[in-house]
Amino acid sequence: MKMRTIAKTSLALGLLTTGAITVTTQSVKAEKIQSTKVDKVPTLKAERLAMINITAGANSATTQAANTRQERTPKLEKAPNTNEEKTSASKIEKISQPKQEEQKTLNISATPAPKQEQSQTTTESTTPKTKVTTPPSTNTPQPMQSTKSDTPQSPTIKQAQTDMTPKYEDLRAYYTKPSFEFEKQFGFMLKPWTTVRFMNVIPNRFIYKIALVGKDEKKYKDGPYDNIDVFIVLEDNKYQLKKYSVGGITKTNSKKVNHKVELSITKKDNQGMISRDVSEYMITKEEISLKELDFKLRKQLIEKHNLYGNMGSGTIVIKMKNGGKYTFELHKKLQEHRMAGTNIDNIEVNIK
């Protein structure tokens, strides 16, 4: 009988020990799962308790398992976040699920955010490209504008562009400059600081200095001079002055003048063909300077007869009422000392 009781007790102890071992292994697994959610509870403590329970016996093992469960529940209640309490309680019931499933769920919840950001960045990067590419599509009718701009050009301008001779570029550039005419001006002298004297006029609050050369140097003394007209073409910065001209000073009209002068133009091209053109040139001044006359005549010849295009030699002959004459050579600029005022009878132009 004693042997039977000993055998029964040994079997009971064996069953209890196996049950305690399973309980402790489950408790260790639960502690590992809870360590991810609750502030990293150390698992070594549970293992030590399990070893003590195995040696102590089945009753102590069961009590320790119950105590460990009671110890876990307050630790879960002390978690800082309420959302984590709910998730930990549900996960304690499902201890059999592996830890990898939780990592998958975390990865699934975390991955959509960067994908959305990438999609937003791609859309933002593609949208400005469409804005940049759209303007050329809207501006497609530009060739129509270029054809319209080409049509108004006169044949003389096209011929001047194609038949430009390099040696006449400087003359063409000078005689196509803008010119200024001011009437009824007041001129005064300042103390000369160079060998050339200058008359100062102030039209429109700008001071223009006019070099007195040739006949003008003797005609105009210290001044001041009232009721004068000036024809101004700005020269190169020869005297370190920003705005200065040479000659072109005449007296203001005392009466209205409409004087028509005969203008005869004879032109001989490179092939030897000769053409003649006779017209009238209107003079509206009692006194006109050779500077103004030379500049306006050459500008008219450039616009209408392609002067300094493929032809640039010849003469302009100005015949005076008193029988004298002035001859301007077209291959060079009018000399400064010949820019004084005069009275004109007729004009002859020969272009070669």
UniProtKB/Swiss-Prot annotation:
Keyword Signal: yes
Biased composition (Low complexity): 114-141
Leader peptide range in chain numbering: 1-30
UniProt subcellular location: Secreted
Region (Sialyl Lewis X-binding): 228-326
Positions with biased composition (Polar residues): 142-164
Main localization, broad class: secreted
Biased composition (Basic and acidic residues): 69-104
Gene Ontology cellular-component terms listed: extracellular region
Pfam families registered for this protein in UniProt: SSL_OB (PF09199), Stap_Strp_tox_C (PF02876)
Keywords: Secreted, Signal, Virulence
SUPFAM superfamilies: Bacterial enterotoxins, Superantigen toxins, C-terminal domain
Disulfides per UniProt: none
Gene3D superfamilies: 2.40.50.110, 3.10.20.120
Job description of the protein: Secreted protein that plays an essential role in immune innate response inhibition by interacting with and inhibiting host TLR2. In turn, bacteria recognition by immune cells is impaired and cytokine production is inhibited. Mechanistically, by interacting with TLR2, blocks ligand binding and thus inhibits activation. Second, by interacting with an already formed TLR2-lipopeptide complex, prevents TLR heterodimerization and downstream signaling. The interaction with host TLR2 does not involve sialyl Lewis X interactions.
Family per similarity comment: Belongs to the staphylococcal/streptococcal toxin family.
Domain comment, as recorded: The C-terminal domain contains a V-shape binding site for sialyl Lewis X.
Assembly behavior: Interacts with host TLR2 (via its extracellular domain).
Protein name: Staphylococcal superantigen-like 3
Organism the protein comes from: Staphylococcus aureus (strain Newman)
